[in-house]
Regions:
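Motif- and composition-driven signal specific to adenylation
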Residues: 1-172
Length: 172
């Protein structure tokens, strides 16, 4: 992974302004591409990494308690965990400054459940293959998703280009 790819992801990225006051939860496996975001977003912006073990993360009530006790401001969840936790710990998730999720097709009702809690400050759907250094596009989600059949993949993050190509590699 090139240094510039990590910088593009977490500094002047157009979707989140991280600072020294941010406390970013590290809930992913270190081998998972999301750990690039979870580690470098706080470190390159003077913030704090809050490492949570897998046993805590898979138990909704313990996870919620840890997020609150550790005053986590930023969290990235895989879509599967996001869908599960919007049903069980939505009030805790609603307290976050940034909640990002991605990794597979997202569930509109899960986003709506969380939005009914009037939080988090920024709810961001992320898309992009691992090869783009975690994600390449983002879409901030607001109440207006209620009429949509699916969650949009959004627009490219700063310093990123996205090309739509056909099966032969030609532009669409």
């Amino acid at each position: 992974v090139a240094h510039r790819a990590v910088n593009r992801l977490v500094i002047n990225n157009g979707y989140a302004q991280f600072s020294s006051s941010d406390r970013v939860a590290w809930v992913g496996n270190p081998a998972f591409d999301a750990s690039t975001f979870e580690v470098w977003a706080p470190l390159l912006n003077g913030g704090c990494i809050i490492a949570l073990d897998a046993t805590t993360v898979i138990n909704p009530s313990n996870f919620a308690k840890s997020l609150e006790q550790q005053r986590v401001t930023t969290l990235f969840l895989t879509t599967a965990l996001f869908n599960q936790y919007t049903s069980s710990i939505a009030p805790t998730l609603a307290q976050l400054k940034y909640l990002l999720c991605g990794g597979e097709v997202s569930d509109v009702p899960s986003f709506l459940r969380l939005l009914r809690e009037e939080g988090p400050v920024r709810l961001i759907h992320c898309y992009g293959p691992t090869e783009t250094t975690t994600f390449a596009t983002v879409c901030e989600i607001a109440q207006s998703v209620g009429g949509l059949a699916s969650i949009p993949i959004g627009r490219p993050i700063a310093n990123t280009r996205v090309y739509l190509l056909d099966g032969h590699g030609g532009p669409v």
